[in-house]
From Swiss-Prot:
GO terms for molecular function: histidinol-phosphate transaminase activity; pyridoxal phosphate binding. It comes from Vibrio vulnificus (strain YJ016). Its cofactor is pyridoxal 5'-phosphate. One of its GO terms (biological process) is L-histidine biosynthetic process. Homodimer. The keyword Transferase applies. Keywords: Amino-acid biosynthesis, Aminotransferase, Histidine biosynthesis, Pyridoxal phosphate, Transferase. The modification N6-(pyridoxal phosphate)lysine is found at residue 209. This is Histidinol-phosphate aminotransferase. Its EC number is 2.6.1.9. Pfam families: Aminotran_1_2. It catalyses: L-histidinol phosphate + 2-oxoglutarate = 3-(imidazol-4-yl)-2-oxopropyl phosphate + L-glutamate. The lineage of its organism: Bacteria, Pseudomonadati, Pseudomonadota, Gammaproteobacteria, Vibrionales. Belongs to the class-II pyridoxal-phosphate-dependent aminotransferase family. Histidinol-phosphate aminotransferase subfamily.
Length: 346
């Protein structure tokens, strides 16, 4: 059957998510998931009816949380669908291109390749910031520029002045897509205030991380109303199941937001605990992180990753040499991981 598939799909290497990689253990710190398992009320009385394309209560709740108008808000099956919608809506296959800056999230590349859109890369600088001159030199045919901040897997924030410079550079040429999947851990760094000034800005958000709803698959795209209307032309007719909309709306209620804020404070404290503990181990380089994960450089990253895996501590290997990404879990999970790494290098 594979020979019937499009040639580009035959050559495609799928994104290796944490679940596809697998593993067995009792400490799962490989997918930047929340350790909190919150309870929600669900109503299954209306499952015989299709959901609204854009459930009004959910859109209103997230728009209020994000500080934008409902008309500037689109919900989808995770932020990953937002990536795909943007590429499908704005890029002509075999004609246009996207641009992204590795090391960064892998789905920009996979989504573009699946659709048949050229992928241009301009690597981040040594301190993992944007190479603005390199981006400018490669903007020909580019319709979308993806920037992740906090960046996954490095954890750093992209300089605000560089984001503004990029928006100015791409005016009337391309859309800058800010992936803010982890912005709830550092909301002061959001670019949402720039939407009023730049019509070529789109922002991706998710409930998977800070809201502890990775299994729900609920994301958002924030942009000007004209851009949102373009995305509504290509989105599926019923993208958000009824239970998803109900649970997500509960998570964005006053009580839900208070709980999420408390849990973010807890996870940020655990990140600081893990960062300090790891930095005290000789030979390790711990990079400052702003999301719910840390990137750590080990003397022998692959060996450390394998040893942890065999001990039931599932971390995430990185394309960066000798680096491993560690999600911030519960304090108990952080203590177990820190204890294992200490013993490994003792």
């Amino acid at each position: 059957m594979e020979k019937l598939a499009r040639k580009s799909v035959q050559k495609l290497t799928p994104y290796l998510s944490a679940r596809r990689i697998g593993g067995t253990g009792d400490v799962w710190l490989n997918a930047n998931e929340s350790p909190f398992d919150n309870e929600y009320r669900t109503n299954f009385a209306r499952l015989n009816r299709y959901s609204d394309c854009q459930p009004k209560a959910l859109i209103a709740a997230y728009a209020a949380y994000a500080g934008v108008k409902p008309e500037q808000t689109l919900t989808s099956r995770g932020a990953d669908e937002g990536i795909e919608l943007l590429i499908r809506a704005f890029c002509e296959p075999n004609e246009d291109a996207i641009l992204y800056c590795p090391p960064t999230y892998g789905m920009y590349s996979v989504s573009a390749e699946t659709i048949g859109v050229e992928r241009k890369t301009v690597p981040l600088t040594e301190d993992w910031q944007l190479d603005l001159s390199g981006i400018e030199a490669n903007l020909d045919k580019v319709k979308l520029v993806f920037v992740c901040s906090p960046n996954n897997p490095t954890g750093n924030l992209v300089k605000r002045e560089d984001i503004i410079a990029l928006l100015e550079m791409t005016k009337d040429r391309a859309i800058v897509v800010m992936d803010e999947a982890y912005i709830d851990f550092c909301p002061e760094a959001s670019t949402v205030d720039l939407l009023a000034q730049y019509s070529n800005l789109a922002i991706l958000r998710t409930l998977s991380k800070a809201f502890a709803l990775a299994g729900l698959r609920c994301g958002f795209t924030l942009a000007n109303e004209e851009l949102i209307n373009v995305l509504l032309k290509v989105i599926a007719p019923y993208p958000v199941p009824v239970p998803v909309a109900e649970i997500a709306t509960q998570a964005l209620s006053e009580a839900g937001l208070a709980r999420a804020k408390f849990q973010v404070l807890d996870l940020n404290a655990n990140r600081a605990y893990l960062q300090v503990g790891l930095s005290m181990i000789a030979g390790l380089e711990v990079f400052e992180g702003w999301g719910n994960y840390l990137l750590v450089k080990f003397p022998n990253g692959d060996e450390l990753f394998k040893a942890a895996w065999e001990s039931g501590i599932i971390l995430r290997n990185s394309p960066i040499k000798d680096c491993v990404r560690i999600s911030v879990g519960s304090r108990d999970e952080c203590e177990k991981t820190l204890g294992f790494i200490r013993n490994y290098y003792s």
